[in-house]
């Protein structure tokens, strides 16, 4: 079988014959798998060959589920192949058939029937396809039968080929032959097509061949692949081609699968066949068992596209049905047919103007009214755009083209013309999205589902510009709850502009943010997010502690634990642990919000669980944290702009980002975090600056206000934790710190006054010191003394004096009075040190915020000066212990002497308060780090030179101390100029050394001669080594160290002011909390504190000035004031942004572009106005000419004048319109063009009958239409009372028209109609079909449409209004399988008053009452109905009666509702069950078109909204 297949396919190229012209109906579609250059992206799943296991699965699955078609009976055809061989009717030769197909000659002469002679067999062509001589491009291919179910092909593509479900189908159709496009237009098309496919995750479906529009698409994908990287995305291009038309297809036949199959692209030898395009990624090759027959793939492709478009795809957290759009380039008759079918199926089409032929014809007439699209106009356009084949067009074809183009243009909502350079359509991707939105907006839906669908598309594709201009308009008022699902989707997919848009359109975060929403957001963090990994660690730790097998579910207290690590332990948990962690909540492990596009309310799918508190304390804070931890810059900025406690929020975000940046491994992400942290710090500075300018006192309150939302911390504490030096160095904050530093003293007091009062405190009573509060000036002496000595500045200086006294006493004891038995001075030092120990202990255990001992210890030892204090105290204790033991007295004194150095170093902390010396401490710290790393470099040279020198000079030195001296110590001193005297041999002396190294106080002598008086080592070598060592160590390395110091100094010096201002806070805070008495008198304060805490159990008081808990009302007022000033800050920022030169240039450019567009539009309007005026003038001249012609003719007939000299006043016009056509053109076009439209649809409903095309101008019977030859169709109906079936007038001879014919009323509301050859003629004109069609009677078929309405009322009973007008509700019904509703009416039985359908939904006992209501109703319409079932000889006429219930308590209304039922029990055996509902009257109600017109008249009758 395999060899036969190969032989058969091998001769297909030579034996092809009679190839039909290809139908250019190639639709296209692009997937969104990430793709780049194949040589760089070998790991891509569809470019890599399947693994052996996958190949085996595919080799077994495809033959079982996918078939091919083979001709099993050879029936000789009358035609020969191109090589002159006999072929079968299928197009293949004898050799290309199976053995069972070769039958005796008895089968010859019989007609070949594909239904009998073609059978399905397991396919033998599938696998990977490799195009030879074209690098290493690899695709997928499969040969399928034309009857293969679409679901099987879809399963193959998504499950076995591994394609992601598309977000969009782009069906590209157009010219099947090569055509030329402008370079710019070609570039725009290629770029836009690939862009929309790559960014939206679309599939592009084309015909797959290497010609025409398919080649254009392939080249677009190729260009993208060559210029992109693996990360930029992959474009999936699927070619659906006919197997029997593929050149060189024999190489694709592999019964067990080709992995890979090589395919040669041979354009020169393809003949009438076609080659596959090498730039397509997947091929579906449709087989019907024939050879050389084009268009076989069209039905399967149409079904496949329809099947895929009915699937649901989730994108950006939103589930929508996969939309489809048709993109048209160039094309011929087949393309026109494809566009026509797409428009009729509701598929939006994008026509690329400038691509040629059909596309340009449609683009040229798309803006014209349908009445102006005439046969002559289309003929003129065809002569321009189809110059080569215009002569082959017949009159029937031109009429058909005119009719189809009229129907296409009539549905403008589905037609989008892409014009190069058109405003708002700079690229094809914008045109495609606009086409989908325009089509969606035109659909009929109840309520907001239609707008919701449009918004889903815009969010899924991240096109906020179109959403702003096309969706959020005055046509629909969005409710905030309707936007909540979209808001969640925008947040998860990081689309900040949509978040801003939703906030602008009414979304309130307090209503949007719930516990379930937050959990949804946190559960859907990106796995690469650092916060996500931290959460996983917390959950794993909880699982470990609980000895649980499964990972616990995420709760907000887990998030709070991670946040506390980032914010610092000065904050409390933002989300406390709930009492019941297993409370009911939504399971949101997947970020998708299930939203069905077709008529399901968003609100019904976005309900929160009830029974517990759902809303958070501060929703803006919660969203802000979520955005910040993911480093979403724009999103965080938008949410911060909504925050109330904005200064604290900005500082907290700065802290979180800086902490995350320390752990982030990705350098780029870390830098972005730091940049965003700086941005938030600047925002905090900006808001605080506005507040401080407005009111200094209230601004300073903001600094120390306890923020409940941010863990009961303060703005100042957050800034310090985040090390926001710029914020802390702000003038307002420094003024506040200065105020705290001076306590209740005036800042104007000089330091010398403070010191004098400390030395002579009675000066306090003389007014020598001034206080901030005037009341202290007049208070009694104790209050003034207390205020003075409690000021931090006084406490600081008193402690300085005390510390200097301690150091002096310590030095005195060490140098003068260090006795075997301690003196009173030494005992005083012990007491002094004990007071220092007590103070350090107090600082360690002081925990007013309840952080815990371990955390307080961690915070305590995080300070360098505290470490130094502890080290000095411990060293003192060690020295004291040794000192008290007589045997270790001297070592004890040494230890205490070293300890004195540490106590002296502690003095540097005092310099922090100095603006000059404070930054220098930082410089010293950083230089010490520089020295530490520098020593590693220096050690290399020191050790290398020292070892070499020691080895050259000294032989076998065994004393370790002298080795160390020779290698390290002497080498180190050499750097500073202490060069050994003997190294050059000049000052060599044996007296200064020990020959054998026996003298412990002398070094061993260098190598000497046998006399021992002269050196034996090479002096030149040691001198050379010394010079090199000094060059590198003394010059190079020391200068490097100096340069490092200089860099450190310059770096710190640039930020001296900020560093000093930041440092002084720690000192101020320390002395603000210290007891007022200095050591050792501080022991009294410690004793008092001990009694309060231990004995009296009095808790520690907070520092009121550094942490202030405000009353609720005061806090609310303060935050409102801050919010107001934040708005001022944001406005100033926007103004400054607009004043930037770059922004001004951009604004000017946009204004110039707008002005140019307006001028162009004005020119077009003027040109159009001129053309209209000329046409009007031409028509007036024609009328005058005809009038004069009539006058002349009348005068001549009356005997006035002779006919010989009469002038011809009616000249032959170029268009030569008859009078009837002139009257047609005078008609004003209405929405229905003035003619019946539905009655002229080419395909008759529920039948495979095609109407004869009837353009608008040929509708009236008076218009001459010589080629009019409509088919005849009369359906057989199972109703007894119907007219007979027949295409002749004989069976109808007994029918009497224009009268009441027995029980049938054949009179028309439009008067007497014409009866021609026994058939009545439709009074509205031609329809393109003769006969009765599916109607019951020839002539008029009368129907009744009751329009039952009532006012729409709210829960309170008041009438609802929209745009000032009252709103109506109408009673409608529909079949379960129908998408549209209808009025409860229809045809009536002869002699009956109520329609049949109305009787089925109304109980029989109410029929008489309803007839009474009909007689009392108001007739709103009576006449012809434009129905698709109408024909030339049968049509529908209706009477519409309005039945309105003004009062909701109307007894007849209640009876009507009681007697309505969903279906008639007698009709249970039928599939015609009707349902009824009350629906709001609106122009978008999904109602049949003719019924909607009636409903509009009823709304106008009552002045209601429509």
From Swiss-Prot:
<feature type="topological domain" description="Cytoplasmic">
    <location>
        <begin position="1096"/>
        <end position="1506"/>
    </location>
</feature>
<feature type="binding site">
    <location>
        <position position="840"/>
    </location>
    <ligand>
        <name>Ca(2+)</name>
    </ligand>
</feature>
<dbReference type="InterPro" id="IPR015797">
    <property type="entry name" value="NUDIX_hydrolase-like_dom_sf"/>
</dbReference>
<comment type="similarity">
    <text>Belongs to the transient receptor (TC 1.A.4) family. LTrpC subfamily. TRPM2 sub-subfamily.</text>
</comment>
<dbReference type="GO" id="GO:0005261">
    <property type="term" value="F:monoatomic cation channel activity"/>
</dbReference>
<dbReference type="GO" id="GO:0099604">
    <property type="term" value="F:ligand-gated calcium channel activity"/>
</dbReference>
<dbReference type="GO" id="GO:0071277">
    <property type="term" value="P:cellular response to calcium ion"/>
</dbReference>
<dbReference type="GO" id="GO:0005886">
    <property type="term" value="C:plasma membrane"/>
</dbReference>
<dbReference type="GO" id="GO:0032956">
    <property type="term" value="P:regulation of actin cytoskeleton organization"/>
</dbReference>
<dbReference type="Pfam" id="PF18139">
    <property type="entry name" value="LSDAT_euk"/>
</dbReference>
<keyword id="KW-0966">Cell projection</keyword>
<feature type="binding site">
    <location>
        <position position="1378"/>
    </location>
    <ligand>
        <name>ADP-D-ribose 2</name>
    </ligand>
</feature>
<dbReference type="GO" id="GO:0097553">
    <property type="term" value="P:calcium ion transmembrane import into cytosol"/>
</dbReference>
<dbReference type="GO" id="GO:0033194">
    <property type="term" value="P:response to hydroperoxide"/>
</dbReference>
<feature type="transmembrane region" description="Helical">
    <location>
        <begin position="927"/>
        <end position="947"/>
    </location>
</feature>
<feature type="binding site">
    <location>
        <position position="335"/>
    </location>
    <ligand>
        <name>ADP-D-ribose 1</name>
    </ligand>
</feature>
<feature type="topological domain" description="Cytoplasmic">
    <location>
        <begin position="768"/>
        <end position="792"/>
    </location>
</feature>
<feature type="binding site">
    <location>
        <position position="173"/>
    </location>
    <ligand>
        <name>ADP-D-ribose 1</name>
    </ligand>
</feature>
<keyword id="KW-0894">Sodium channel</keyword>
<keyword id="KW-1133">Transmembrane helix</keyword>
<keyword id="KW-0597">Phosphoprotein</keyword>
<dbReference type="InterPro" id="IPR050927">
    <property type="entry name" value="TRPM"/>
</dbReference>
<dbReference type="GO" id="GO:0051209">
    <property type="term" value="P:release of sequestered calcium ion into cytosol"/>
</dbReference>
<feature type="domain" description="Nudix hydrolase">
    <location>
        <begin position="1350"/>
        <end position="1501"/>
    </location>
</feature>
<keyword id="KW-0739">Sodium transport</keyword>
<feature type="transmembrane region" description="Helical">
    <location>
        <begin position="1020"/>
        <end position="1041"/>
    </location>
</feature>
<keyword id="KW-0107">Calcium channel</keyword>
<dbReference type="GO" id="GO:0001659">
    <property type="term" value="P:temperature homeostasis"/>
</dbReference>
<feature type="topological domain" description="Extracellular">
    <location>
        <begin position="886"/>
        <end position="893"/>
    </location>
</feature>
<keyword id="KW-0915">Sodium</keyword>
<dbReference type="GO" id="GO:0097028">
    <property type="term" value="P:dendritic cell differentiation"/>
</dbReference>
<feature type="topological domain" description="Extracellular">
    <location>
        <begin position="983"/>
        <end position="1019"/>
    </location>
</feature>
<dbReference type="GO" id="GO:0071502">
    <property type="term" value="P:cellular response to temperature stimulus"/>
</dbReference>
<keyword id="KW-0406">Ion transport</keyword>
<dbReference type="GO" id="GO:0072571">
    <property type="term" value="F:mono-ADP-D-ribose binding"/>
</dbReference>
<dbReference type="GO" id="GO:0043204">
    <property type="term" value="C:perikaryon"/>
</dbReference>
<dbReference type="InterPro" id="IPR005821">
    <property type="entry name" value="Ion_trans_dom"/>
</dbReference>
<keyword id="KW-0106">Calcium</keyword>
<feature type="disulfide bond">
    <location>
        <begin position="993"/>
        <end position="1005"/>
    </location>
</feature>
<dbReference type="GO" id="GO:0002407">
    <property type="term" value="P:dendritic cell chemotaxis"/>
</dbReference>
<dbReference type="GO" id="GO:0009408">
    <property type="term" value="P:response to heat"/>
</dbReference>
<keyword id="KW-0109">Calcium transport</keyword>
